[in-house]
Regions:
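A short, contiguous, amphipathic alpha-helix enriched in charged residues
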Residues: 195, 233-246
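Flexible helix-coil linker/hinge segments at domain or subdomain boundaries
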Residues: 200, 244-251
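Short, solvent-exposed loop/turn elements at beta->coil junctions and helix N-caps
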Residues: 253-258
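ATP/Mg2+-dependent ligation/transfer catalytic cores
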Residues: 1-204, 224-233
């Protein structure tokens, strides 16, 4: 095991002796974060040998059902592949009541090469093509989301949250409304603080076109893989901080039939 890997997890455990568990995370092709929760002492084994996940993880649709046509499911025995740590992604998760940690993983085959369906591998192939042209893509990801009341309405449909400032259910549709940022200042401050603790370069927060609709932007990065890793982690962070504040967050394109849709996770790029 390389010295830098040993240093990373040992330093983390030394700095957080009260950590009670570590979430081992990997994103599927839909950007859904999946994983396992292990005790802190398991980190040594994870950093040394990796941890097994089923390869069919990359054959799941948005509902979690395996698409057998991918050839990654039962047809090949639904076997496992090794997942190894992505450097510099081991961090705490400050939205949990107890001290918890998380680590982002990537999947490799028996020869320690990326599994063909691994989205990080697909992206890396695109990056290599840019390198062949002596170009460097620089990107920043923008994430739009809705904050929701943790409770559904009487018809079991999602509904906007109640503002802690006004005591009323949100109905504002004013884009760039500073008052909306003030009303949800505690939540947005929690997102900013958690992002800073995790080393995620979150930048600007914007109130969007519908009640409880916001956008958080990441800074530009010349490391495209890192930028996308940070986007995946920011989505988890936003959902966690929302829950911490008694709400839910969704990145669903259109949770309400009569309100503005959410733009897809968009990228600003230059080369």
């Amino acid at each position: 095991m390389a010295g830098s890997k040993v240093k990373e997890y040992k330093l983390f455990l030394d700095q957080h002796p009260d950590v009670s568990g570590i979430d081992l995370l990997i994103a599927d092709l839909n950007g859904v974060v999946r994983g396992k929760r292990v005790v802190p002492s398991a980190l040594e084994k994870v950093y040394k040998n990796g941890v097994y996940f089923t390869t069919s993880l990359f054959a799941l649709d948005i509902n979690g059902d395996t698409i057998e046509e991918t050839g990654l499911g039962i047809v090949q025995g639904d076997g496992d592949s090794t997942c190894v740590p992505i450097p510099k992604t081991l961090s705490t998760t400050p939205w949990h009541k107890q001290t918890m940690g998380q680590l982002l993983l990537t999947m490799v085959d028996d020869n320690n090469q990326p599994v063909f369906a691994n989205p990080r591998h697909v992206l890396n192939q695109v990056i290599d093509r840019f390198k062949g042209l002596q170009l460097t893509p620089v990107i920043a990801v923008e994430l739009e989301f809705y904050l929701l009341d943790a409770r559904r309405d009487r018809n079991k449909r999602p509904q906007p949250p109640i503002s802690k400032t006004t005591g009323k259910r949100e109905n504002n549709t004013q884009v760039y409304a500073i008052n909306d940022l003030d009303d949800y200042g505690d939540f947005l401050s929690g997102v900013s603080a958690a992002a800073q603790e995790q080393g995620i370069p979150a930048d600007t927060a914007v109130a969007e076109n519908a009640p409880g609709q916001f956008e958080v932007n990441l800074k530009h990065e010349a490391d495209t893989l890192s930028a996308c890793d940070n986007a995946i982690l920011l989505k988890r962070l936003i959902k966690g901080v929302a829950q911490q504040h008694g709400m839910k967050a969704t990145f669903m394109a259109k949770p309400y039939t009569d309100l503005a849709e959410i733009g897809r996770a968009s990228c600003r790029e230059r080369v």
